[in-house]
Amino acid sequence: MFSLQDICRKHLFLLPSSFNEYILQVLGLYWEKHGSLQRIRKDAVFVQRNITLSTNEALRIAASEGNERVVKLLLSWEGNFHYVIIGALEGDQYDLIHKYNSQIKDYHVILSSIQNANTFEKCHQLYNCTMWRLVQNAIKYNMLSILQKHRNLLTDEGDNQELFEKACEEQKYDIVLWIGQTLMLDEPKSIFDIALERIDFSLLIMGYSLLFANKMSSIDIHDEEDLTSLLTEHLEKAATKGCLFFMQETLKHGGNVNIAVLSKAVEYNHRKILDYFIRRQKCLSRKDIEKLLLIAIKDGGSKKTLNLLLSYLNYSVQNMIGKIVEAVINDGDFTIIIILKKKKINLVDSVLAGFLDHFHTYCFIKVFIHEFAIRPEKIIKMAARKDKLDIIIEFFNDIYPHKDDLGTILNILKNIVNTMKHKEGKEVLIGLIHKIYRIIHLENKEMFNLVRFYIMHNANIQFISICKDCFNLAGFKPFLSECLDIAIKKNYPDIVRNIKIQLKYE
């Protein structure tokens, strides 16, 4: 008989109509006060052949009635034993509770399944929870009636503040409103911080509802300056998040959309906000838009953001070129230079000059050089004019890293000097040429060519130095005699005098 009962309980999904109450009782498929009980699928049962219940709901009801036989049956039908505890709590069936309680390691796992506030509270009592834990969980699981029931115990402003913030974080709006309207709070403004952090529009509206209902004692809504300051702060935070609809809601109550507010939209590339307030609402003057453009440059704004701001200025930036160059030099982002160059506004030379003035290593400007395909001769000449010998050396070390390349570098420098007019710049490069000459080996002809080069550019010190190395070379004096004519024609008296001195020696 036991095996027949077991088979029927587990596998009989359709009860024959001929089964009367007695047979059902024998098979264990009869529920007192309810009628026949049969399993119709894995998660549902049929009661009295016409009522469909989920297995867990039936389990809860059976447990609340203390019907252990039906409870066992439903558990064998894959019912969740959590509902045994819930139902037993509802019906005060403590024998069942003690029997199944040991299977629950953490009572929190059943709280989300409890719908009844009294049962919710009984569960906390069963597990010896504190009142503080009860009210915290009441917020988490949206049991407002529990907070209302224990209203007289919620007197500490600090604790209430924590509960209020928890309700905001959990997005339990009814509880937020009740706490805000009913309990004393330390800092109710936190609702705005949470609303903006979570981008919760409902919470923002609720915050303004509490604010203008005078439920925030720390804020005097009748003090226009304080109120404007608060609302403008909200606008700034909303702009940071890119929440245009938050800003529109805030503006219904006041606040100012100013440079500080829109600079946040610039910093985080929220172009919809910029377009709405600059183009559609016309909130800013041209001067203010120029300030925003400089902020965008300093913050490394995206191409789209920079283009948007430039479009408001019709790409007319002649009156602020100096400021643009300064911003790029100080902050190192040259996206704006790329954009303006495409619009036929070329600031490459100005920025390169600024980089050379402000930085002392080649690596700072290497990316810039590659981006704009700047010719090596141009960089070297500009660095020489500014006496930035270290940058010139770093540049050549990057392009020509091997010692065997020094001869090539020497020839490049000579060619640059030949096309250069800046006197001090030429002297810097000639000094570098002579240092390279001291390191490498030159053939006689190459040395004579270098002598002529020094004479052509009136490099008297280097000329005297190389003459000491060439003095005993064959053909040097006849060569020097030829060079004398060059020095005379060029009117280089110091060179002429030193050549004559060299020619006097036998």
Curated annotation (Swiss-Prot):
| Family note | Belongs to the asfivirus MGF 505 family.
Q: What does this protein do?
A: Plays a role in virus cell tropism, and may be required for efficient virus replication in macrophages.
Q: What is this protein called?
A: Protein MGF 505-4R
Give the species this sequence originates from.
African swine fever virus (isolate Pig/Kenya/KEN-50/1950) (ASFV)
